[in-house]
Amino acid sequence: MKKLLKSALLFAAAGSALSLQALPVGNPAEPSLLIDGTMWEGASGDPCDPCATWCDAISIRAGFYGDYVFDRILKVDVNKTISGMAAAPTAASGTASNTTVAADRSNFAYGKHLQDAEWCTNAAYLALNIWDRFDVFCTLGASNGYFKASSDAFNLVGLIGLAGTDFANQRPNVEISQGIVELYTDTAFSWSVGARGALWECGCATLGAEFQYAQSNPKIEMLNVTSSPAQFMIHKPRGYKGTAANFPLPVAAGTATATDTKSATVKYHEWQVGLALSYRLNMLVPYIGVNWSRATFDADTIRIAQPKLASAILNLTTWNPTLLGVATTLDTSNKYADFMQIVSMQINKMKSRKACGIAVGATLIDADKWSITGEARLIDERAAHINAQFRF
């Protein structure tokens, strides 16, 4: 049985190095691995010993914490219907009608998944150990992210077929689905807290559990929207939140004179519980575990308008192309009808699509004072984690 357990854990740890795939689960035996201190000699405290003191029971470890998510499995969290848009145009030619009248429509972002979601964290790690069995730990560092999805996942909309030249109270009437939206965040302060403990030990095997919570609030550094009828890139985008984000947007939306705009900030929250099994092989401690986690990335459904000029220069207010379709001449009486107007997109709330995952890793110990842990995670994300620490 012991040989089978050793083989299974070693195979899992080796396999993870070949295919790197929530928060790290960590080695369940970690609280009891470093039993000697770099600065102070370790004391093996026994909670059943009447002469034991808290000085014997408590120790501190510190180190580096790096977590790198290459692809988190996320989806957008939106309602089934969207309000405020005008009805979709149906006329074979001419202009669209009723573009100032709101009509409830099916939300084309509903059920959409993100194509790519990356999250990188580098932090300092500090753990308070009790009786060489339980850890209470925290991390303080910095995180940044990248998100990519189809344009319909972020409600990219616009107005086509505008009659006349008055933009007041005009509402978008078409969705722009054949495009890509990319979000790059800046690097912002992040923190996490957690606890880990050994629940059961038998010889060299340890079964343990852990709980963690992490948070960060980075701002959107770059927004890139690529589609045929409208494309734009914004550095440090600003937009409308709350009731100000409702259609119709202000006429000045997207211009340099726009007011009541706010920075686009992504509020990241994640919590996780995990269970793992390890087996010590001298200096190497491989482990395998499962985790259940929930992550959310919420930007308060901020709506960001396409940049445009307040007044035309060389007959242009945006770089949007003219769309003639089957027409052979321009409609000079409705000069804004043939290209996309009042384009905007919304950063919808994103959350985990899969809650459960698997973690495999191994810890290398040196002199019972130093350790380095590598871990890979699969199913709910593809991620790698590294932790190097020492005991004081």
Curated annotation (Swiss-Prot):
Signal sequence segment: 1-22
Keywords per UniProt: Cell outer membrane, Cell shape, Disulfide bond, Ion transport, Membrane, Porin, Signal, Transmembrane, Transmembrane beta strand, Transport
Cysteine-cysteine disulfides: none
Cell compartments where the protein resides: Cell outer membrane
GO terms under biological process: monoatomic ion transport; regulation of cell shape
Main location: membrane
Sequence similarity: Belongs to the chlamydial porin (CP) (TC 1.B.2) family.
Subunit record text: Part of a disulfide cross-linked outer membrane complex (COMC) composed of the major outer membrane porin (MOMP), the small cysteine-rich protein (OmcA) and the large cysteine-rich periplasmic protein (OmcB).
Full protein name: Major outer membrane porin
Organism in which the protein naturally occurs: Chlamydia psittaci
Taxonomic lineage: Bacteria, Pseudomonadati, Chlamydiota, Chlamydiia, Chlamydiales
